Curated annotation (Swiss-Prot):
Any GO MF annotation of the entry: 3-phosphoshikimate 1-carboxyvinyltransferase activity
Binding sites annotated in the UniProt record for 3-phosphoshikimate: 31-32, 36, 175, 177, 322, 349
One term under GO cellular component: cytoplasm
NCBIfam families the UniProt entry points to: aroA
Enzyme Commission code(s) on record: 2.5.1.19
Organism ancestry: Bacteria, Bacillati, Bacillota, Clostridia, Eubacteriales
Subunit structure: Monomer.
Matching InterPro entries: Enolpyruvate_Tfrase_dom, Enolpyruvate_Tfrase_sf, EPSP_synthase, EPSP_synthase_CS, RNA3'P_cycl/enolpyr_Trfase_a/b
Protein name: 3-phosphoshikimate 1-carboxyvinyltransferase
Binding site for phosphoenolpyruvate: 31, 103, 131, 177, 353, 397
Function: Catalyzes the transfer of the enolpyruvyl moiety of phosphoenolpyruvate (PEP) to the 5-hydroxyl of shikimate-3-phosphate (S3P) to produce enolpyruvyl shikimate-3-phosphate and inorganic phosphate.
Active-site residue list: 322 (proton acceptor)
Reaction(s) this enzyme catalyzes, per UniProt: 3-phosphoshikimate + phosphoenolpyruvate = 5-O-(1-carboxyvinyl)-3-phosphoshikimate + phosphate
Gene source species: Clostridium tetani (strain Massachusetts / E88)
Length: 439
């Protein structure tokens, strides 16, 4: 059982690029922080404001689910006002909860549902319904949850046990979503939960829990959490650093571009793709300005650049998992080859992103190889200059990535389904119209 896709399959045609762009931008709120501003921000009882909440389809899905649990949300001009009854008073029985396309929503809310003891069926769309869930169900059930599923996929049937015990858990894969699920369930459990990471992953959950004064301790790769008194606090969602990647790519690939992105999330783990682009030779600088709810925020300056290929080790891959498609495209226009180590997790995203990258780069004339889970991009492409058809595989990051290829194509670029971009970057054409001639 799954919810059917709702995309309208609307194609997009790009009629070439603009050679010069000089502009300053502010971006919609970061999707990862946006999810957590509700999922974690609404755990304590009380009222708070969220500024710059992203309007992406995934984040709106999270908002709807929190309302179903009993959280009241009022959308005002400059912020959204959240009034939460507190996790102790969340509704305990809901027929089903639909996570749409959002893997983050499904895995994080699963930890909360298990910890609170909600009886429900957790479902998603066709894409989400084939993504692996055993990785969260097994640790939750070992804590005392009662969750059933068929094979490794949604729907997840929560029996509403609600009496979890802390767990000592060593991560089997590098996944911020799995880690976050266990930490949230651990916070809502009796006793201490310890999570050990094989390699570090994104830490937005830890930062947000610490911001609302949760009892969480972090030492090297071990995280320890237990239930404690927490407080409602206002949250500002910095500009989305993942969406920024596509605008940055357009500027790098452009002939004469210079852009500034203001008030962007500069979390140390999330900005690693910027460091990789700098290593490749990108004319790129970022400057931290301040902190908001435990996250670093600042500005990014980018200019058109000539790049060289690099090798990206497996220890870096978990940090840049969402940016590998766009770095792969940029690497196609770099001198030499670029190697991404241990990219297997890309198979389990909204699409098989390894396949999507290789299929579309081939259509551009770029040679790629997959050798023992290492993705190799052979650069050297200068211009495309032919009509190309991009297959998005209904994946927002693939659509956004290969839109950027049009910065080197004087002919038409056709994208088969642009509507899927609403998952993460709605109204993105308001930004990209500065770079492209768009039908």
């Amino acid at each position: 059982m799954h919810k059917e896709e709702t995309f309208n399959q609307c194609a997009l045609t790009i009629n070439g690029y603009k050679s010069e762009v000089k502009k300053t931008y502010e971006l919609p709120g970061d999707k990862s922080v946006g999810h957590r501003s509700l999922l974690i921000g609404a755990l304590p009882k009380g009222e708070y404001k969220i500024r710059n909440f992203p309007q992406s389809r995934d984040c709106l899905t999270t908002l709807k689910i929190m309302e179903e649990l009993g959280v009241k949300v009022k959308v005002l001009k400059d912020y959204i006002l959240v009034n939460s009854p507190g996790y102790e008073n969340f509704k305990k029985k809901i027929d089903y909860i639909d996570c749409g396309n959002s893997g983050t929503t499904s895995r994080l809310i699963a930890g909360i549902l298990a910890g609170v003891g909600v009886e429900t069926n957790l479902v998603g769309d066709k894409s989400l319904s084939i993504r692996p869930m055993k990785r969260i169900v097994d640790p939750l059930n070992s804590m005392g949850a009662n969750i059933e599923m068929e094979k490794d996929h949604m729907p997840l049937i929560f029996k509403g046990n609600g009496e979890l015990k802390g767990i000592d858990y060593t991560m089997e894969i590098a996944s911020a979503q799995v880690k976050s699920c266990i930490l949230l369930a651990g916070f809502l459990s009796e006793g201490v939960t310890k999570v050990r990471e094989l390699s570090p992953t994104r830490d937005h959950t830890e930062r947000m829990l610490k911001y609302i004064e949760g009892n969480i301790k972090i030492e090297n790769k071990e995280i320890e959490i237990e239930n404690s008194t927490i407080k409602s606090k206002d949250i500002y969602v910095p500009g989305d650093i993942s969406s920024a990647a596509y605008i940055i790519a357009c500027a790098i690939l452009g002939e004469d571009c210079e852009i500034i992105l203001e008030n962007v999330l500069l979390n140390e783990n999330r900005r690693k793709y910027l460091d990789l682009l700098k290593k490749m030779g990108a004319n790129l600088k970022y400057l931290e300005k301040n902190q908001c709810n435990g996250e670093h925020v600042g500005n990014i300056l980018v200019k058109s650049s000539f790049l060289k290929g690099i090798s990206i080790g497996k220890e870096i891959t978990p940090y840049i998992i969402d940016e590998i498609p766009i770095i792969s495209l940029i690497a196609s226009f770099a001198e030499g080859k670029t190697i991404f180590e241990n990219v297997e997790e890309l198979k389990y995203k909204e699409s098989d992103r390894i396949k999507a990258i290789m299929v579309n780069l081939k259509s551009l004339g770029v040679k790629t190889e997959l050798v023992e889970n290492n993705l190799i991009i052979y650069g050297g492409l200068s211009k495309i200059n032919k009509e190309i058809n991009i297959r998005t595989f209904n994946d927002h990051r693939i659509a956004l990535t290969f839109l950027c290829s049009a910065m080197r194509n004087s002919e038409k670029t056709y994208i088969d389904n642009w509507d899927c971009v609403a998952i993460s970057f709605p109204n993105s054409l308001n930004y990209f119209k500065d770079f492209f001639r768009i039908n």
